[in-house]
């Protein structure tokens, strides 16, 4: 657990199908921890004794750390499914001596060559001593050139006081192999389970850039046959860099199995670059690159992107933020795909987990916050109007002779009549729809909550409208440009533009009926009905066509009955990830009944039932990589749909009364909202508001 191998195991890695070569003193072939996993290519490269050594268990202990079975007993190796190729290289007769086993450079070289011939991915050398001779160096060079990784222990002279020994560097044997094998050699020192350098371990020194630490202190356990040795009730543990090295060798096997595309040099790079800090930040002369961290080595590294594409993506990035019209559509959405990291390793990725709900509108709060007051003047056929915000104190403006106050101009409009039948309106920070409504003399009902809001946080920039009357009918052409922004724009600063163009025909059906029919076109640069999607989901951009009918009926004096609606058809811009076929249908509507002079002269009492803009059907038709073939280095793509139609449907009902009272404008409202924001799980929202405003 110390090195995070459980992450690899949970991902299905065990080292199965890979071979760990170990040049050492042999292995206990009868130990059930290795049952069925000792390679037939194992050999005694120093004689003809066989690989089983009854006089020394050093090689067995090394093999246990690297590859002991997952059998619910005793030791479990880092790569518990790997095949062990034991290459016995101890000089015959030396293991029985007082000084223990010795290994000649010639025999070690034979073992390394045998590992290359058997197709091993890593060779473990838990050995030490003097610098390697020319023959052994050449064998290491051949092995690393063939892609084999050489893992060698740093040495156990950390507490040595012998002037001929330098405990602050790996022993000469390890250093010489690093010099011979270069980038495919890792030297391994030892730390305790607390992550502290073991007293006995040689330090990284001048080999720090290729030096890893792994646990080599208090390593369980010594076996007798297939059973753990127990002495006086205690299990026997072992210490030494000899048992730190096979932890790294096991990690190599896990990576090689899980990611068959990796070269030896890439595996070494991964293990070194993902090591966790043990001492000073960065590479240091004690811990080298740090402590082996298998979990980090298995996590994506470097730049990441969708497999088989040039689309960048990351595990923690936001894949998309929906708009108000989409409500709870992406709740629980799953978009399984495949991502490659900087090493070309494939990972499963659920883009649905990166989808976020857009900030819900709070229509009552927005209405009550409004601090704008209109001001303007007319001169003949020209009128100029401003909306001024009292809440801002940045710019002093002279709004009228003798009037000074701290204010900000929120919007302005210029309307001019050209002849008797033609009008033109220009607006700054005013929507084209508002300009068109002004030219058409539409009297909009004043409701605080129940509207037909499109769910987009949209800020108009420039707008225009032109109207031509033909007898009892009129044609209005309007257009404008807006910014689609986020309420938290001060933090995000991201704004995308959209453009609108519309044409409407309006007329009268006698004295009691007004009607209009509009057609609209909206083009969004990077958004889809106000929603933003990352490049992994197509990146956004859409064109929406709308049909917008409306009718007002006056059945008797003072009464108004009206209905408006909008039906939209959206086509999302095609990309490599969303090549086409992404369509949405959306709608909004409102029904009004109003009475002028209901309670007092000049008042208006109204009732509205409405639905804000809602996606009725459709979504993104994505073409995402769903599998990766390491053999051919190609992705298999599949259709992955993302519905943007919410489960909830907001319905708003509001009763509103407005009148001139106490030298000001008074309004009162009672409202009820079902599924607010188009969220089916959201509780109903009901309330009321009273507002009185006056100018001073």
What label would you give each PLM region?
Residues 65-66, 87-90, 121-122, 216-287:
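Hydrolase catalytic cores
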Residues 419-421, 470-473, 508-512, 556-558, ...:
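Outer-membrane beta-barrel channels and translocator barrels
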Residues 1-4, 113, 120-124, 184-187, ...:
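C-terminal subdomain of the subtilisin-like protease fold in secreted/lumenal serine endopeptidases
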């Amino acid at each position: 657990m110390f090195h995070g191998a459980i992450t690899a195991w949970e991902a299905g890695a065990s080292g199965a199908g890979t071979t760990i070569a170990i040049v050492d003193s042999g292995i206990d072939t009868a130990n059930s921890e290795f049952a069925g996993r000792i390679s037939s290519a194992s050999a005694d490269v120093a004689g003809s004794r066989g690989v089983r050594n009854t006089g020394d268990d050093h090689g067995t202990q090394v093999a246990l750390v690297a590859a002991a079975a997952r059998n619910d007993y005793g030791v479990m190796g880092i790569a518990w499914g790997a095949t062990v190729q034991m290459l016995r290289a101890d000089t015959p007769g030396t293991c029985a001596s007082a000084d223990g086993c010795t290994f000649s450079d010639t025999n070690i070289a034979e073992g390394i060559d045998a590992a290359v011939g058997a197709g091993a991915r890593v060779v473990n050398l838990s050995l030490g001593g003097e610098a390697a001779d020319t023959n052994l160096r050449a064998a290491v060079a051949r092995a690393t050139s063939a892609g084999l990784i050489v893992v060698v222990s740093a040495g156990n002279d950390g507490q040595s006081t012998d002037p001929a020994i330098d405990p602050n560097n790996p022993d000469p044997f390890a250093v010489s192999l690093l010099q011979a094998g270069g980038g495919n050699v890792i030297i391994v020192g030892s730390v305790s389970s607390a992550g502290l350098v073991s007293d006995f371990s040689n330090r990284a020194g001048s080999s720090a850039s290729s030096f890893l630490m792994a646990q080599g202190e208090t390593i369980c356990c010594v076996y007798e046959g297939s059973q753990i040795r127990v002495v006086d009730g205690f299990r026997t543990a072992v210490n030494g860099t000899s048992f730190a090295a096979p932890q790294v060798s096991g990690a190599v096997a896990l990576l090689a199995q899980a990611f068959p595309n990796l070269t030896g040099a890439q595996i070494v790079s991964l293990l070194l670059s993902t090591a966790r800090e043990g001492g000073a930040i960065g590479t240091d002369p004690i811990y080298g690159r740090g402590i082996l961290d298998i979990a980090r080595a298995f996590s994506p590294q470097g730049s990441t992107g969708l497999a088989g594409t040039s689309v960048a993506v990351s595990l923690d990035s936001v894949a998309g933020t929906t708009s108000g019209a989409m409500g709870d559509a992406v709740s629980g959405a799953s978009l399984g795909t495949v991502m490659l990291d900087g090493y070309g390793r494939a990972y499963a990725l659920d883009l649905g987990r990166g989808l976020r709900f857009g900030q819900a509108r709070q229509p009552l709060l927005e209405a009550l916050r409004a601090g704008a007051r209109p001001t303007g003047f007319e001169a003949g056929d020209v009128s100029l109007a401003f909306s001024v915000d009292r809440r801002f104190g940045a710019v002093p403006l002279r709004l009228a002779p003798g009037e000074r106050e701290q204010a900000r101009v929120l919007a302005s409009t210029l309307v001019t009549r050209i002849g008797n039948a033609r009008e033109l309106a220009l607006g700054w920070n005013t929507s084209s729809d508002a300009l068109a409504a002004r030219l058409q003399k539409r009297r909009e009902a004043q409701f605080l909550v129940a509207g037909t809001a499109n769910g987009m946080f949209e800020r108009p920039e420039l707008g225009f409208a032109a109207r031509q009357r033909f007898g009892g009918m009129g044609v209005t052409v309007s257009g404008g440009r807006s910014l689609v922004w986020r309420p938290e724009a001060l933090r995000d600063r991201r704004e995308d533009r959209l453009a609108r163009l519309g044409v409407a025909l309006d007329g009268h059906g006698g004295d009691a009926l007004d009607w209009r029919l509009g057609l609209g076109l909206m083009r969004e640069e990077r958004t889809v009905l106000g929603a933003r999607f990352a490049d992994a989901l197509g990146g956004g951009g859409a064109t929406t066509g709308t049909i917008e009918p409306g009718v007002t009926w006056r059945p008797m004096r003072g009464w108004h009955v009206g209905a408006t609606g909008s039906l939209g058809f959206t086509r999302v811009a095609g990309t490599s990830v969303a090549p086409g076929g992404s369509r949405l249908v959306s709608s909004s509507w409102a029904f009004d009944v109003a009475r002028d002079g209901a309670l007092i002269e000049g008042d208006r009492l109204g009732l509205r039932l409405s639905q804000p803009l809602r996606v009725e059907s459709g979504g993104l038709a994505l073409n995402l990589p769903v599998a990766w073939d390491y053999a051919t280095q190609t992705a298999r793509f599949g259709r992955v749909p993302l519905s943007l139609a919410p489960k909830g449907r907001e319905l708003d009902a509001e009763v509103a009364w407005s009148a001139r009272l106490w030298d000001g404008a008074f309004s009162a409202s009672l409202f009820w909202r079902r599924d607010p924001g188009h969220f089916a799980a959201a509780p109903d929202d009901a309330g009321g508001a009273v507002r009185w405003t006056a100018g001073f």
